[in-house]
Amino acid sequence: MTDLPVDKILDTLGLRCPEPVMLTRKTIRHMQQGEILFILADDPATTRDIPSFCEFMDHQLLKSKTDTPPYEYWIKKGI
């Protein structure tokens, strides 16, 4: 992890597309604007899907670690 403060952690290890993004959407829907979600994943599809999800839904991908699994993502909820 990093020194970024997180408000919620989502562990999607072992899940495959489309489950990680579906759970991300469901989780972030119940968060407040500006809160940070940390996601842990091992599905290679998340390296494409999570950034696309953030762009499409107007959330901010603060940081990602995708060089080797498990992949890590820090998302700041937008509007």
UniProtKB/Swiss-Prot annotation:
Chief location of this protein within or outside the cell: cytoplasm
Record-level GO cellular component terms: cytoplasm
Record's keyword terms, sorted: Cytoplasm
Gene3D superfamilies: TusA-like domain (3.30.110.40)
Database matches in InterPro entries: Sulphur_carrier_TusA, TusA-like, TusA-like_sf
UniProt family annotation: Belongs to the sulfur carrier protein TusA family.
Descriptive protein name: Sulfur carrier protein TusA
Source organism (scientific name): Haemophilus ducreyi (strain 35000HP / ATCC 700724)
